[in-house]
Amino acid sequence: TAYEISTRDWSSDVCSSDLSHFCNSMEAINENQLKHLISLGISHHVDQTQLLAYGHDETEDFVFPPELVLIPKTPEEISKVLAYCHSEGIPVTPAGARTGLSGGALPIHGGVMISMEKFNQILHIDTDNLQVTTEPGVITEVLQQAVKAHGLFYPPDPASKGSCFIGGNVAENSGGPKAVKYGVTKDYVLNLEVVLPTGEIIWTGANVLKNATGYNLTQLLVGSEGTLGIITKIVLRLLPHPTHDVLFLVPFFDAATACAAVPAIFKAGIIPSGMEFMERDALLWAKAFTGDETVPVADTHQAHLLIELDGFDQDQLMREAEQLFAVLETFETDEILFADTAAQKSALWNLRRKVGEAVKTQSTYKEEDTVVPRFQLPNLLNHVKAVGKRYGFKSVCYGHAGDGNLHVNIIRGELSDAEWEHELPKAITEIFEEVIRLGGTISGEHGIGYVQRPYMPLAFPEVTLNLMREIKGVFDPKGILNPGKVF
């Protein structure tokens, strides 16, 4: 590797690819080190029950308990911890709300977990400059509602926005339905306060909209998945909040046709604020999970597009809606459902946001976060189904069709342990190879974390991966911070 990683080989896999339900983390802290870290006076957990609770996120099948959980309140406390762990070669895993889907917050090598749950204050809403300064432990939806009270808008809205932390969104470069019009987290981050793995505290940029001063460290930290530093303050730009929106649920008789309609809508000059794709089973499972009895799904409906338009002029929105209908008339669709009340809109969005949870109730599954140019969505969908036929698994697909981000859920169903453990990686590799061939990549918003590491060589040649390792080595010479993630 490009740098020495303490005295241990943190880069080796602790847990084999058999998707074990429980993985024993390495013992990385000796008794004297544990006593010293506890003596720092930071709130902590060492009870085994608590450690187990912190040892998982929303990734299917993995639990890696840390040896010590520290819950600091200030950057200076984090600095003391990291400086000591750097000197001792102790692995440190930063964690937010642990809602991630790639194992990014799993302490796979034991050691210390630093939980950011007490960094939960919105520090300043600047209504003149349309900015907000926040700590990373603020729940994303809480932040959105706080700025909305001032007529302002923070668009990125991952499905877990009601529970995830804004710091985790920055670490993962999270997206969500509104990314199709408004972009993802990186498009709103202006400046970050970060504690480096060696203990230094820095700001990465400036609280301005334009900055051509030196390397863009801010954007390097966004999406770095907790491997380069621990974010302690975030400055975000905001927008005026749209005053009007309209929402439509469009049923299609063929799933690939629904995907094909997506680029046609954009080609017509329409930029939706949301364009979500749901295969038949995705919507049916969400309806069953939520108890919905209002949204009709006919036997002939194979997929739906949930399309939102927003803006500041109701008449203009109606004109855009007419344009949208004109495009949809060129495809075979059934009767379009128009949500004309806030309650109806909320119910439709709730169905879409609950698809992921609904899938969990059906079977053991593996979710992939593929993204391709949106005109390639029909080809990707057809390939996923073809791979499923070859390997004998069912798949349920849904996601952010407007930006080509298709969540592929591989359902275990009746597959044997051997088939699931040994054939699944082959099937995923075939899907990812096609994604790359179509001009896409292996993760649009969930990140690489722990579970997607084996597939990184499909996305990048070795020279690029080595460059990433070199960057990691500059920030983290001993490789203590979130080891075993990304590459």
Where do the PLM segments sit?
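C-terminal substrate-recognition/cap domain of FAD-linked oxidoreductases
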Residues: 46-52, 236, 240, 246-251, ...
